């Protein structure tokens, strides 16, 4: 699998990273249990995936830790996230420290490679910089984390307002950014900055419910059109993707979604969350295929040019 360097971190990450969140949360979100989650993590490592992402709020750190405690820590990159507020207030320094230390215990490790502040809202950004970030910087000096990241709440911040502000600063080594076939606004709003500043980019939301199958996409777009949130021309996306599949240039809508993100300049690693070993293996096959045909992109992308209100959720 292709390896990309995460910005200036010098971390060499596989094109596909295993995501411990999303709808499935390694299957625990579908009540498949922790043993199944552990099988998915092990299958990812066995397939050569070398970046694993989770968060204290996902309840998948323990399953991941149960697997990686038996793996050479230098063979993979471990990423987790801090929930920066509790009961509507910013966590004080003692609670920020306690959050990371609890994550380390669940993950059975003495450090994480990337520690993100999770889902930062624009209105909270300055307070996070003033009060939360210094705690992470101190813990980095203690060796508990190597790099500091920030993620956006893409489901509600589809215009990347928080990360557009954060990208101007020099604080962040890695960013987790929402990007997919329905909303590729990060291309113009963020990637030129992250590339210039050497900020590593993890892609989330490559595939969400809307992009799983033709029926989901048709229903998703129709509801947005009926509500006046989208132009009716966006409905042409479904037949265009169907045509791509029927011509044998793509096996599924999901494959198209992964390939779209995999070949986007500015994206270093695409996160894939699943609770199925079989789905994981298929995603690994799909993401390593060539870029989508230029002729298809020339017809598809204008449908969503300027669209910033969708996450695909």
Regions found by a protein language model. Give the residues of each.
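Glycine/proline-rich, positively charged
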Residues: 26-28, 32, 42, 89-181, ...
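Glycine-rich phosphate-binding "P-loop"
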Residues: 20-34, 150-155, 236-247
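N-terminal binding-site loop/beta-alpha segment at the start of enzyme catalytic domains
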Residues: 1-76
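Alpha-helix-loop-beta-strand connector modules within alpha/beta enzyme cores
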Residues: 61, 65-81, 133-144
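Structured C-terminal cap/extension of enzyme domains
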Residues: 45, 171, 189-313
